[in-house]
Design a protein with these regions (language model features):
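Periplasmic c-type cytochrome electron-transfer domains
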Residues: 1-165
Length: 165
């Protein structure tokens, strides 16, 4: 099974869909209606869906304190840098918009799209197959993107930072 990519920011963080099967969300909207819903959608309707998706804006994270990172999240930002999370989760949307192979999965040989970390606090479960119930599990249990030893404290701080984005 696979986890779905959030539609938030989907029109500015191509490719579309977690498998990157569509070059953009503009393409995904049209092909989704045609090949999944089997509806020949007039272009003006597809444009309305595009405009709606473009209108979605991230909400401030409830992990922020008065709009700022907590001390724990600030330490987590340093952990983010230490483990080079920004090699894949970079830029204003915290994504390089590339496909990456994760583990031994062969279902999608090209890899999985790097999702934005914006509003990740509201999109559990995590990882491409939804196996991580919490952000801390992503790092502490599944060691996502981490090739070094991570302490429980570092995993907790990193989760706090990522959930603050």
């Amino acid at each position: 099974s696979k986890n779905c990519k959030s539609l938030l920011l989907s029109h500015v963080t191509p490719p579309a869909m977690i498998s990157g099967i569509r070059a953009s969300s503009y393409v995904a909207v049209r092909t989704g209606y045609k090949y999944i819903q089997f509806i020949d959608l007039p272009e003006e309707f597809a444009t309305c869906v595009d405009e709606y998706l473009l209108s979605l804006k991230p909400l401030p994270s409830p992990f922020l304190i008065n709009g700022e990172l907590s001390e724990k999240a600030k330490r987590g930002r340093k952990v983010f840098e230490k483990f080079k999370c920004d090699e894949c989760h970079s830029g204003p949307y915290y994504t390089d918009m590339q496909l990456h192979r994760i583990g031994e999965d062969v279902e999608f040989e090209k890899g999985w799209d790097t999702p934005t970390l914006r509003e990740v606090w509201r999109t559990a479960p995590y990882l491409f197959d939804g196996r991580a119930a919490t952000m801390k599990e992503v790092f502490e249990v599944y060691k996502h993107g981490i090739d070094k030893k991570i302490s429980s404290k570092e995993a907790d701080e990193l989760a706090e930072y990522v959930n603050s984005l």
